[in-house]
């Protein structure tokens, strides 16, 4: 089967992060052979809606995903906090959120609005997309907000295992990336670095050999046809390289709630999230992981390497 070009592009990280590796690979530091294929299967966007939470909790309970991340400003945070406290060993990070993308379902910051005005659109919500966020957000206000999100999570009994960035806003400018890296190090948390062939040298210069960086990211994009969804992920498994790769999935049930939340937004919408859920919970997906000798790991494992 021909390799999907999207997969090829995303695996650029395998070579990009090599320069930051230590004398031992992450696999070796975790006790595996150097040529091991380690995989984090990661569910984004917990707390956006009950439908997303239910699908993600089910996938976590079934070990179909190994990790997930939480959007602290979102309305269903209390539900996620209850799950986190009931399942303290689950691998839950924070999906640091500086945008609010849905048409009729919006949220604002955790920090007081008067302390982060550059984060707000004219309606008083977080910016609806990455481009206006990139244009308007001041780095010092971004830092104030992401620290507020972390402290809010901690206050609710959530002990995050890692950090990443919703819609990649914190990768959009070097000063925002600097804030992201600074805060992750301050809280002693590993962070996802979404780097690619066009990553500015200023961003790369902010990374250190002490940072625990994964080697690759795979995520479905709008170019993947609905009838090719399963093949996209199965091909990705077959093409895994040695190192640590993360599959980023967006889970949910294609029900009335999620259809309303994601109205007029088919990309990452209800049907998209149902497809992701169907594939990663399927017996075929699990068997292919086993057949290709893929070792499932968590961000919690990587976090131990920082201590």
What are these regions (language model features)?
Residues 29-31, 56-62, 79-91, 108-121, ...:
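Acidic (Asp/Glu)-rich catalytic clusters
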Residues 38-40, 65-69, 89-95, 160-164, ...:
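Structural preference for beta-strand elements that scaffold enzyme active sites
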Residues 3-4, 19-40:
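N-terminal pre-catalytic segment of deacetylase/amide-hydrolase enzymes
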């Amino acid at each position: 089967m021909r390799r999907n070009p999207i997969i090829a592009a995303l695996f650029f990280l395998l070579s990009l992060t090599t320069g930051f590796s230590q004398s031992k690979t992450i696999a070796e530091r975790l006790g595996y052979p150097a040529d091991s294929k380690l995989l984090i299967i990661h569910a984004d966007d917990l707390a956006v809606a009950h439908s997303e939470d239910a699908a993600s909790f089910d996938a976590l309970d079934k070990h179909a995903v190994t990790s997930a991340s939480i959007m602290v400003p979102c309305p269903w945070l209390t539900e996620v906090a209850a799950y986190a406290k009931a399942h303290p060993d689950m691998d839950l990070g924070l999906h640091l959120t500086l945008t609010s993308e849905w048409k009729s379902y919006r949220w604002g910051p955790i920090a007081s609005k008067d302390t982060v005005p550059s984060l707000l659109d004219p309606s008083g919500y977080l910016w609806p997309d990455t481009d206006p966020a990139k244009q308007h957000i001041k780095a010092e206000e971004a830092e104030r907000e992401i620290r507020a999100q972390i402290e809010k999570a901690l206050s609710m009994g959530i002990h995050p295992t890692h950090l990443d960035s919703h819609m990649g806003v914190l990768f959009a400018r070097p000063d925002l990336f600097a804030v992201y890296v600074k805060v992750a190090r301050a809280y002693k948390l590993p962070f996802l670095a979404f780097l690619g062939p066009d990553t500015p040298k200023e961003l790369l210069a902010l990374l250190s050999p002490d940072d625990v960086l994964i080697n690759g990211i795979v995520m479905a994009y709008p170019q993947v046809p609905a009838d090719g969804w399963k093949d996209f992920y199965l091909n990705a498994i077959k093409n895994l390289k040695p190192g640590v790769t993360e599959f980023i999935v967006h889970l949910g049930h294609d029900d009335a709630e999620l259809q309303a939340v994601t109205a007029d937004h088919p990309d990452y919408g209800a049907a998209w999230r149902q497809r992701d859920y169907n594939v990663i919970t399927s017996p075929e997906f699990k068997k292919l992981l086993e057949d290709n000798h893929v070792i499932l790991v968590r961000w919690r494992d990587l976090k131990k390497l920082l201590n």
